[in-house]
């Protein structure tokens, strides 16, 4: 289990195997290489700098496999937020965990 933060520095949750989870236990996505896809197969972002989540604006129309999300897990107290990084051109911050509904 590896904790991850948005590019802006907000604690998002963790990666367990090929799955992305919010800190409050929602299964958000599957990881294909470094790209993250939601349960409908839509690109939602990628992993950069080992533990940061960011979204490439040019990839928002990309699709991969769909999947059935796992049930909710136990919630964790979120890790401390970090200072955000400067945004790269053509990217935007990964959505916060609260924006994903189950």
Language-model-derived ranges and their functions:
Residues 3-4, 19-21, 36-37, 53:
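Well-ordered beta-strand segments characteristic of repetitive beta-sheet solenoids
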Residues 1-14:
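Short, compositionally biased leader-like segments
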Residues 5-7, 23, 64:
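Intrinsic disorder/low-complexity segments enriched in polar/charged and small flexible residues
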Residues 1-2, 42-102:
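Long terminal segments
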């Amino acid at each position: 289990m590896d904790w991850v933060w948005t590019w802006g520095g907000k604690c998002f949750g963790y990666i367990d195997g090929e799955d992305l989870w919010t800190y409050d236990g929602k299964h958000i996505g599957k990881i294909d290489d470094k790209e993250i896809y939601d349960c409908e197969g839509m690109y939602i972002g990628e992993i950069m700098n080992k533990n940061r989540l960011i979204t490439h604006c040019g990839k928002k129309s990309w699709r991969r496999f769909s999947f059935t999300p796992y049930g909710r897990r136990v919630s964790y107290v979120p890790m401390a937020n970090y200072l955000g990084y400067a945004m790269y051109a053509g990217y935007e911050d990964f959505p916060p965990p609260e924006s994903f509904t189950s």
